Amino acid sequence: MAINVEPALSPHLVVDDAASAIDFYVKAFDAVELGRVPGPDGKLIHAALRINGFTVMLNDDVPQMCGGKSMTPTSLGGTPVTIHLTVTDVDAKFQRALNAGATVVTALEDQLWGDRYGVVADPFGHHWSLGQPVREVNMDEIQAAMSSQGDG
């Protein structure tokens, strides 16, 4: 029997406390837990969530699964990746994330590219941008706005 495979791109997050991270993502982003797999020591070696209609995977920091290195944002001194969520009612969703324990990285504001946009850091060091299109903007307008920002 053939298995139907849907191509997908899913972030796989490494965190210091996957069970707490799942609780946070449920509160902050209305995530739905799809499942979790604990390892012999009780750490989660795999978990999957549905956020904004897409799968996000995560696990506890298990260095032996990562070439012997700790791979959490806290152990690495930050994260070079921001996960973006396009949402409706971005003000409410941004505040919900803050109420759940996220901190502001970039304040929520209307941006020159047409989105109301801001960035939060979750308690585990991962960055999440939230945006909502609020006006249509073409590339020429964006480039003109960027050029005018350089004048001054």
From Swiss-Prot:
PROSITE patterns the record matches: VOC (PS51819)
Pfam families in the record: Glyoxalase
Gene3D superfamilies reported in the protein's UniProt record: 3.30.720.110, 3.30.720.120
Segment forming the signal sequence: none
Start and end residues of each VOC domain: 7-133
CDD domains (alphabetical): VOC_like
Name of the protein in question: Uncharacterized protein Mb0911c
Source organism of this protein record: Mycobacterium bovis (strain ATCC BAA-935 / AF2122/97)
Source species taxonomy: Bacteria, Bacillati, Actinomycetota, Actinomycetes, Mycobacteriales
